[in-house]
């Protein structure tokens, strides 16, 4: 099995719902985005073209982050996903430097530490972040998802790296990654690239797919088909 993803740019509306769903599902800290995007604006008024390409870990066949990791923290699982054993991460950032896509993040500070602030924004008028955290019964952030902790630390610790896992904890339960289910236009499909009958394989066969930075030779498993269709003319 080789899990991969197809993103149909013609269906994508650039809403960012995938990124919001990812942050909610995976408890990522401020400024850390497992699901992100490349947005470009071309042309001059009144003929302007806007393009939006969602990005995430490509779970490459020949993942450079796995090759350079000195402890084996970055590794491949039986589905071909590029995963990380956070307990073995020493924070050396070699994986970050090796990744040609810039999709690996580093926790330079303790994640979600703003929720440990016990000062009220408005004295006697609002609760403090810490008070709100305690009222929800959460440990790190009020909207934390404990299910993320099934296969990976629920909150990744300071001085470790982290990245998209294709929501492996959801895959284990037969569910799609959060970004796939959240997409309002169903632009994302995940499936087995080794199965010629899978939807991802059929889409790749039907359309001429694109991969990000193919010249890097990493064998990315995220494929893009068709083109983002927003063009504004006044």
Swiss-Prot record:
[4Fe-4S] cluster 3 binds at residues 57, 60, 65, 99. [4Fe-4S] cluster 1 binds at residues 12, 15, 18, 183. Induction: The arrA-arrB operon is induced under anaerobic conditions in the presence of nanomolar concentrations of arsenite or low micromolar concentrations of arsenate. Expression is repressed under aerobic conditions and in the presence of nitrate. The peak of expression occurs during the exponential phase of growth. It comes from the Bacteria. Its cofactor is [4Fe-4S] cluster. Disulfide bonds: none annotated. [4Fe-4S] cluster 2 binds at residues 22, 164, 167, 179. Pfam families: Fer4_11, Fer4_4. Keywords: 4Fe-4S, Electron transport, Iron, Iron-sulfur, Metal-binding, Periplasm, Repeat, Transport. Residues 3-32, 48-79, 80-109 form the 4Fe-4S ferredoxin-type domain. PANTHER family: PROTEIN NRFC, PROTEIN NRFC HOMOLOG. NCBIfam families: arsenate_red_ArrB (NF041715). Component of the arsenate respiratory reductase (Arr) complex, which catalyzes the reduction of arsenate (As(V)) to arsenite (As(III)). ArrB is probably the electron transfer subunit. The periplasmic localization of this complex may allow the cell to couple arsenate reduction to energy production before arsenate can be transported to the cell cytoplasm and enter the ars detoxification pathway, an energy-requiring process. This is Arsenate respiratory reductase iron-sulfur subunit ArrB.
């Amino acid at each position: 099995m080789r899990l991969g993803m197809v993103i149909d740019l013609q269906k994508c509306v650039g809403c960012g719902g995938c990124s919001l769903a990812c942050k909610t599902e995976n408890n990522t800290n401020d400024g850390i985005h497992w699901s992100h995007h490349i947005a470009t604006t071309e042309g001059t008024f009144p003929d302007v073209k806007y393009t939006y390409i969602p990005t995430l870990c490509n779970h490459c066949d020949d993942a450079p982050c796995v090759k350079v990791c000195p402890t084996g923290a970055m590794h491949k699982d039986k589905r071909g996903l590029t995963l990380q054993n956070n307990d073995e991460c020493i924070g050396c950032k070699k994986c970050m430097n090796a990744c040609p896509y810039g999709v690996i993040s580093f926790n330079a500070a303790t994640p979600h530490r703003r929720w440990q602030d016990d000062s009220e924004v408005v004295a006697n008028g609002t609760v403090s972040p810490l008070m709100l955290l305690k009222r929800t019964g959460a440990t790190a952030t009020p909207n934390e998802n404990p299910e993320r902790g099934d296969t990976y630390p629920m909150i990744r610790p300071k001085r470790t790296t982290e990245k998209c896992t294709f929501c492996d904890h959801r895959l284990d339960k037969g569910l799609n990654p959060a970004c796939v289910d959240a997409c309002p236009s169903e632009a994302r499909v995940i499936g087995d690239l080794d199965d010629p009958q899978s939807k991802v394989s059929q889409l790749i066969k039907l359309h001429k797919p694109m991969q990000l930075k193919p010249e890097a030779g990493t064998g990315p498993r995220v494929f893009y088909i068709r083109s983002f269709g927003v063009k504004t003319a006044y």
